[in-house]
Each structure stands twice: as structure tokens, then as C-alpha cells.
Amino acid sequence: MDEDEFELQPQEPNSFFDGIGADATHMDGDQIVVEIQEAVFVSNIVDSDITVHNFVPDDPDSVVIQDVIEDVVIEEDVQCSDILEEADVSENVIIPEQVLESDVTEEVSLPHCTVPDDVLASDITSTSTSMPEHVLTSESMHVCDIGHVEHMVHDSVVEAEIITDPLTSDIVSEEVLVADCAPEAIIDASGISVDQQDNDKASCEDYLMISLDDAGKIEHDGSTGVTIDAESEMDPCKVDSTCPEVIKVYIFKADPGEDDLGGTVDIVESEPENDHGVELLDQNSSIRVPREKMVYMTVNDSQQEDEDLNVAEIADEVYMEVIVGEEDAAVAAAAAAVHEQQIDEDEMKTFVPIAWAAAYGNNSDGIENRNGTASALLHIDESAGLGRLAKQKPKKKRRPDSRQYQTAIIIGPDGHPLTVYPCMICGKKFKSRGFLKRHMKNHPEHLAKKKYHCTDCDYTTNKKISLHNHLESHKLTSKAEKAIECDECGKHFSHAGALFTHKMVHKEKGANKMHKCKFCEYETAEQGLLNRHLLAVHSKNFPHICVECGKGFRHPSELKKHMRIHTGEKPYQCQYCEYRSADSSNLKTHIKTKHSKEMPFKCDICLLTFSDTKEVQQHTLVHQESKTHQCLHCDHKSSNSSDLKRHVISVHTKDYPHKCEMCEKGFHRPSELKKHVAVHKGKKMHQCRHCDFKIADPFVLSRHILSVHTKDLPFRCKRCRKGFRQQNELKKHMKTHSGRKVYQCEYCEYSTTDASGFKRHVISIHTKDYPHRCEYCKKGFRRPSEKNQHIMRHHKEVGLP
């Protein structure tokens, strides 16, 4: 048989278990080979203890074998002993290694290693086939004499398939059967008989402790092996087959001749430290230590009698820790994010996206596990005979970010402490703050919760300055509420309506009180009438007063526009629709907003719009032609003779041959009179309450009342001793003595040269229309408020209707 050359290549976390059958040749020494992800140092010390750790040894002659994922350190002076006489011996072992970042191929002579042809282990075959999801286990694989490494493979080789896909949720099957000599490679968990007949086994065997992390209750009935009770309380993630599982495997040194291994052990809060090397570090009093399901397994002879488990006296040293499942944190986190959307919100999320050992330094207080509680911390004791076991102090825990995120320290794959960012909601841990921020989007119900809440209302915000500004608004509101004060008694009210009701009480008490003007002898029983008197008579800034509401204006044109609010007159009508407006500016705005599409053509100078191009061209001629037609009476210029004629007739012609039969108003042209007559259609005549004057225009009636029926006329004409309320009215009156045409009122002695003033006089003075009548005395009023005040004053025993 030719000599085989094989390569040692590290694989993903797989375990090789040796099942010693009845026909297998028994050799002294350790009987288990474990392939792990971390760096492994195999010592050649012939002792009952073996050192396996993840630190670089002190021996400078060690050969370093590196791979992308893991590092393995093996001393060069490894010897192999003859175990199988019929097997061929592999003289040369080619081991690729990276020393000082350079690729070196070194031949290590193993003169006594026997490698048969039917080697199926993926890390021993010459083809170096990578099988991350399968573990090929021989029935005889031994590590003997502590410092001598042997790989033995018999003819009857079976294949054990262990699924370690990080995206598969059921990593640990619901039932683990342990037997011996089965068609498949089975891990025997039967207890080791105390009365072992082979007393020559003086060396120790290696045993495994598998932490299932509350995957289910592990039961052992002696004959059938170790099973997982699927009826026990399971994780929701496992039921849905969406969450990956992490298995922790702890390898112990124990003496099979003295201890019975196998079965299940529950480590509870009352067992802070046991006899088998697993120490539960002290936790804070406020953190509850959860129960952890653990099973201890060993390779045992199938012919041994089943005994009850006794793990109280297991060996004092844990010398290896292996984690199976979730090798890649990023892939697991991505898979968890995909499945998390399908999990019900009420179900508890019970998986952790990082496959690192959850261990802390001495100064760590704890970390939330995937169930939201603090997990017990496992401590690996140091053996007295292991002098070369390096001690590594973990880095100090970083100060947590008090603003948003907290940090935790765990032991990474390379053995060094790493800072992670745990999610405080589901317990997931991430390498960077950015991954945590991205993960927090999966908890919208918690992101919606805001930090700051207003104690006075339901306002919430995440910014402190926003809450401060909101509280200031409460202060301003409280001040504004207190700002409404009664001027008679000083009482404060929250709104104007309450103040108005309160003032009615004062009016009832002082119903007979007369309000006097401080500038003249005018007096009235109503405060509102006194206010209007002050505005109309003694106000210089707003001489033109509205008799309906008492509002003053600087110019008569403004008062005229305002009076349309009370009369409801809307003389401006849209030529495209039935829209009417009391103001020309509102009509222009209406046309631009509503009919801009109907008139797409605009003038570039004045921005007026037209329906077609011909109208635009005709309109532009107005801007292009020079205004050559000069008015002989003023500085007005027109672009054509027709415009000039229209200007002369309307401004400089005092003869109005066309008179209105209803209001006696004159016009220059019949068309103007026709438009004016249309105003009177549908309108009722307004009668003055002081005289027989009536007019259709209420504005003229208001001017009539103010000018004729007001006794206070401080401005007197020196020539005719006629009185006027304002100085500008006196100036207009003085023009009547200069020979100009005077408009004489037919109802009184009022006369003026101003046609608009004459119209206002007739409306304000000689109008007698009071639409709001009292139901009890039939007295008329101009506004409903005046009628209500009258009822409260004179008919208070009846009350408001």
C-alpha cells in the first residue's frame, strides 16, 4: 500500500467522537478528538492533564498553521506510536502554514502514524475536501499518551451528519439518541460502570458537556440514551423554525473508573460552584440566574452496564470550550432580520445573532441573554500542572453611551474581549452602533415612544429643547387667559364671551347711567354710542366713521368699500362666471386664479390676460402709442380722442342731463344712467329715523344721519354760521361761497359742492330703515346686538328670546 500524504485543514466547528466498540483495539490515553474554531495548542507533556487553549505558546519553535478562519498551533516534536500493525505508515505529512505572513510548506515526519486507505475524515484526506455541514467519524480515533497523536480508522466506517448551518433553526434535533454499534455514528451517553473490569485503564478519558441553552429538557433513561423532551416549554423561534441555535460544548477531564457520567444536570441559583470545574460567577442580587440545561457525555463501551448518573464528582477542570452554530455574525443577523418580520410581536425573541462565548471579565456586571435575563458566567479553572497556560486580562468595560446605547464586553473568536452593542429590547448583540441603529428599526413600537412628556397635556417629544419651548407656550397661554379683564371690577376671564356675559350684570345695575363725552356736551345711555361719537367727532386720524359698526377710515372711498359689508352690495361681476365681488381687487384675484387657463395670453407690460391673440395685440397698442391728447382743464393725457372725451365729460362737466328717478343722481350719458338704475332693482328704500328722508343706498343714509342729525358741530362757517363736524367739511362748504355749483339737500338745509359728499349725506341722515325690531315694544334697531342690549335693559324680566 502506498504511503498517503494528507493535509491538515481546519474546518468549521465540528466534533469527532470515538465510540469504542467491542472489536476495537483499546489504547490508553485520551479518546476524543475535537476540531474547534479557535487556536489549539497540543502539548506533549505526559501527564493526566492536557492543555488546550487559544493563546500563542511560549515555545518559539512551535509551528503555526493558519487559515482564514482559525489558527492551530502544534509542537513540532509530535510522535505517533504504532497502533495498527496492518495499516500503512504515512512517512510524510504536508502541512501548509503561514509563518510571519509568508506561505511555507513544511514536511513534518511522523514515522509511526498509520493512515489506512479508507480515511473519510475531511481534514485528513489528501483531497482536502471541505465539508462544513458533515462530520465523518470513524469508530476508532484516539489521542493517546497525551503527547502522541494517532488517527485510527477501521474498515467499518460510518458517517455522522451534523447540520451546523447558521441559517437553520433546528440545529439540535428534538431527540438525541445515544447508543453504540448502531448503523450510524452514535454518541453513547450511558453512564460508566463503577465496577469496570478493566482496571488497567489508569489514564483519564475526555468527556463533553453540551449546553443546549434551554432548548428543551434532556432526559436520560439509561437504555435509550439521552433524549430531549419536545413537550417541555420550547422557544417560539424553534417552533417556527426561524431562529438559529447555539450549542456550547465543554470538554472535561474525568476518570471513567471513578465517576459515572452522562445524563442531565440542572445548574440552579443555589449551586454557585460545583465539583466539575464549572463555576457560576457572582451576580448582582437584583439579577436572577437562569437555569441552564447541561448534559455530560463520554464514549463508553456498549457492553458496560447502565448505572445511575453521578456527576457530583466529575473532574475539576474544564480545558476546552466549543461553540457549534452561528459562525458568521453578519449572516446570522441578516437571517434573523428576515425572519423577525414573520414572528408575532407577542412572542419572545430568544436568539442571539453573534456566535461568541458569552463570557465577561472580572469587572463585568452581567449581560442580558437572549431571554432578556442575566445569564450565569462560566469560569474555566486553571490547573496547577498547566504552567504554560497564559493569563489574559480582559479589557476594561467601556463607559456606556448614556444618550442612546449601552455597550457590553464579550470574548471574541480570537480570545480577546470585544465591545458589542446589545439591543435592550430583544437582547441581540452587534459589532457596531450602526448595525444596532439599523436593527432598532425592527422595533417601531419602541421607537414611537418618546422620551419627554408634558405634564400638562399629551405632548411628547424626543428633544429637550422642544419640551422647553412647549412648556413656555403653556406659560404664555396662562398669561393670555388672565389678560382679559373687566374694566369695571377688575375680574379676569378666559375668553371674550364670558367677559361679555359678565358685563351684562354691570349694565343691569347701571341701566339709568348716562355716558358723557369728555370733549363736548354729548351724552348717551349706551357706551357703544359714545364710542362711535368719539370716533366720528373727535378723531382726526379716522374722520370717516361707519354708523353701523363705528369703524373709522381716512378716506371716503375706504368707507364706501366698507359699507358694502353691511349692505351686501357686490357691484363687480366676473365676465366668465357668476362670481360677484364688493371689491375690484378681489375680482382680479378671482380671474387670475380661476380663469387663467381660459385666458392663456398675457400682456408683457401689465400682465393682463386675454382669451386670444387679437385682444393682446389691441391691448399692446395702448402701451405702444404715445399719449398725445392733452386735457385742457388738467394734466391728464389720453392715447386717443375717445378716452379724452370720456375724461372731460366725467370730470370737468358739471351738467348731468340724465337724472335717476329714484335718487335724483345725474349722469353724463344714458349708458351710465342705465347701469345705475340696475343698482336700484331689487333693493328696498332706507328711511331715516329722524326725518322723512329715504334712499336705496345705505351709505348715503349714514352720511345723512351723521351730518344732519348730530348736534355737535364744532366747526362753524364765518359767513353763514353753519356748523360742521370736521374741518375738511368746512373747507368744502367755503367753496359754496366762491360761486361754484352747490348741491342742496331737499330734506334739509344741507348743501355742498361735492357730489359724493352730498350722496353720503342723504344716505346717512335721511334713512329710516331699522330691520331688527324688538318683539315686545316693536322698536327698531340697526344691528341684532343693539336689539339684545335693549331687551336686557328694558325687558330684563322677560329675558332674551
Swiss-Prot record:
The keyword NADP belongs to this UniProt entry's keyword annotation? no
User: Which of UniProt's keywords are assigned here?
Assistant: Activator, DNA-binding, Metal-binding, Nucleus, Phosphoprotein, Repeat, Transcription, Transcription regulation, Zinc, Zinc-finger
Q: Which domain of life is it from?
A: Eukaryota
| Pfam family of the protein (one) | zf-H2C2_5
Q: Does the keyword Nucleus apply?
A: yes
Record's GO cellular component, any one?
A: nucleus
What job does this protein perform?
Probable transcriptional activator. Binds to the consensus sequence 5'-AGGCCY-3'.
Supply the name of the protein.
Zinc finger Y-chromosomal protein
Q: Which organism is it from?
A: Gorilla gorilla gorilla
